[in-house]
């Protein structure tokens, strides 16, 4: 597993690059989100290494702040298989599924969607505070 870090995220990628069908990903690609302290997230991420390298999990990324969150990517057809891997790997906290690009599908489960976005917002604020969050967003906009 390769680890790549930028200003906001640490990516956990397979050792060997895999091609991605963009159309398939836009329609069916998503992620499991888990929120916890940074130390727990990093320990958990390293437990996913064999599953990322084997292709059972496409990839993962975690928020660099503390508290943190990890996104574990897969196609929706593998969603339940990946959830079982996460549970066996120690994901004790509530996890939530969210589509990456198929936003209309996210709205089919409004409670999960609201939980996901509220948790993301709180994680950013707890990690950086209000002023720090604004600076982070400003820097992130420069990076693209």
For each of these PLM feature ranges, what is it?
Residues 1-144:
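Structured alpha/beta or helical-core interaction and ligand-binding surfaces enriched in interleaved
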């Amino acid at each position: 597993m390769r680890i790549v870090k930028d200003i906001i995220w640490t990516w956990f990628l397979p050792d060997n690059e895999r091609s991605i069908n963009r159309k398939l990903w836009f329609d069916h690609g998503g992620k499991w989100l888990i929120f916890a302290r940074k130390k727990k997230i990093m320990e958990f991420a390293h437990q996913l290494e064999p599953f990322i390298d084997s292709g059972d999990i496409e990839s993962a990324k975690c928020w660099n702040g503390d508290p943190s969150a990890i996104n574990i990517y897969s196609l929706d057809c593998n969603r339940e298989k990946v959830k079982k891997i996460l549970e066996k790997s120690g994901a004790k906290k509530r996890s939530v599924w969210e589509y990456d690009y198929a936003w209309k599908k996210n709205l089919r489960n409004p409670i999960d969607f609201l939980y996901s976005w509220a948790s993301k917002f709180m994680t950013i604020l707890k990690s950086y505070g209000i002023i720090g969050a604004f600076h982070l967003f400003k820097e992130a906009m420069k990076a693209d």
